[in-house]
Amino acid sequence: MNAEKSPVNHNVDHEEIAKFEAVASRWWDLEGEFKPLHRINPLRLGYIAERAGGLFGKKVLDVGCGGGILAESMAREGATVTGLDMGFEPLQVAKLHALESGIQVDYVQETVEEHAAKHAGQYDVVTCMEMLEHVPDPQSVVRACAQLVKPGGDVFFSTLNRNGKSWLMAVVGAEHILRMVPKGTHDVKKFIKPAELLGWVDQTSLKERHITGLHYNPITNTFKLGPGVDVNYMLHTQNK
């Protein structure tokens, strides 16, 4: 395990990095700011593992890994996992938690574009969860993910749709009313319509395989996957 610093790349929003650096120490607090990520992680992991035909023995890259919630869970499934993030503090938290948990994950501080320049075609599975809406050029991230995966490999994206409902649910509801995440976490202007994401995918070697919505029920306080991509959604693609 290591957390290495690397040169600054153009596709970095330093204000976004600073937001997550400020709360990095609470990444593994199950009742803290990242509680929603802990709550949805079993759904994300299950979707990825099922669609990829299992993770055991596979080489996996988690782009925008943060404090390592998904990366660790994929390593527990028997994958060899590398986690990428540009936040130094979240990576330190991820590294320490993996050490305490006895989980082997290789954490690297560099952009996905930098990683793709050195490791093209080396991964069986690439995941990019809740990251695209936090960078200046999300299409560049999609291109890099396509470059990193092996032929026949799987790439997974998740993000937020851009519309009135997603603003009400993710910003007004989650940030201001329910206070599920810190205020300022989301910028609706950076949300991505499924048609936009699919358009970027179509310009790479990736092919869409499946898309699903991630839904929150405030009455039952539960999450589930299902039809409807009007707020949160996940996309499974495969390298041709």
UniProtKB/Swiss-Prot annotation:
UniProt cross-references to Gene3D superfamilies, sorted A to Z: Vaccinia Virus protein VP39 (3.40.50.150)
Molecular function via GO: 2-polyprenyl-6-hydroxyphenol methylase activity; 3-demethylubiquinol 3-O-methyltransferase activity; polyprenyldihydroxybenzoate methyltransferase activity
GO BP annotation list: methylation
Classification via CDD domains: AdoMet_MTases (cd02440)
Catalysed conversion reaction: a 3-demethylubiquinol + S-adenosyl-L-methionine = a ubiquinol + S-adenosyl-L-homocysteine + H(+); a 3-(all-trans-polyprenyl)benzene-1,2-diol + S-adenosyl-L-methionine = a 2-methoxy-6-(all-trans-polyprenyl)phenol + S-adenosyl-L-homocysteine + H(+)
Top-level class of the enzyme under EC nomenclature: transferase
Keyword line: Methyltransferase, S-adenosyl-L-methionine, Transferase, Ubiquinone biosynthesis
Entries under InterPro entries matching the protein: SAM-dependent_MTases_sf, UbiG_MeTrfase
Coiled-coil region list: none
Origin: domain of life: Bacteria
The protein's Enzyme Commission number: 2.1.1.222, 2.1.1.64
Binding annotation for S-adenosyl-L-methionine: R44, G64, D85, M129
Record keyword Transferase present: yes
Keyword Methyltransferase: yes
Pathway note: Cofactor biosynthesis; ubiquinone biosynthesis
Pfam families linked: Methyltransf_23
Function: O-methyltransferase that catalyzes the 2 O-methylation steps in the ubiquinone biosynthetic pathway.
Family to which the UniProt record says this protein belongs: Belongs to the methyltransferase superfamily. UbiG/COQ3 family.
UniProt-recorded name of the protein: Ubiquinone biosynthesis O-methyltransferase
Organism the protein comes from: Escherichia coli O9:H4 (strain HS)
Gene name of the encoded protein: ubiG
